[in-house]
Amino acid sequence: MTRIKRGYIARKRRTKIRLFVSSFRGAHSRLTRTITQQKMKALVSAHRDRDRKKRDFRGLWISRINAVIRGNPKVSYIYSNLIHSLYTRQLLLNRKIVAQIAILKENCLFMIANNIIKT
């Protein structure tokens, strides 16, 4: 078989991969075989963690809401009852917005909870 000299095409492909992994440590940014492996691993991790980030933030919002509601003796609510009553009253407040209200303006959250209790 004759030898195929790839010339600039292979070099172009490798330099493109090198630019992607240039910030990696050690051989992961220098050796061609490990560069391709680390690029694939990085892209897989990025894809996986985009979904994981959504899960983590939802859990964070839930724990923030629950901590603020349970911490106040004025309101006898727990998280699940609050969310259930929000849905039954058809209030369009998602967990992210309720968590921001809980952190920034606790009084508003307690006003919302008290109005839900009264009705």
UniProtKB/Swiss-Prot annotation:
It comes from the Eukaryota. GO terms for biological process: ribosomal large subunit assembly; translation. GO terms for cellular component: chloroplast; ribonucleoprotein complex; ribosome. It comes from Phaseolus vulgaris (Kidney bean). SUPFAM superfamilies: Ribosomal protein L20. Keywords: Chloroplast, Plastid, Ribonucleoprotein, Ribosomal protein, RNA-binding, rRNA-binding. InterPro entries: Ribosomal_bL20 (IPR005813), RIBOSOMAL_L20_CS (IPR049946), Ribosomal_protein_bL20_C (IPR035566). Belongs to the bacterial ribosomal protein bL20 family. Pfam families: Ribosomal_L20. It is found in: Plastid, Chloroplast. This is Large ribosomal subunit protein bL20c. Binds directly to 23S ribosomal RNA and is necessary for the in vitro assembly process of the 50S ribosomal subunit. It is not involved in the protein synthesizing functions of that subunit. One of its GO terms (molecular function) is structural constituent of ribosome. Its main location: plastid.
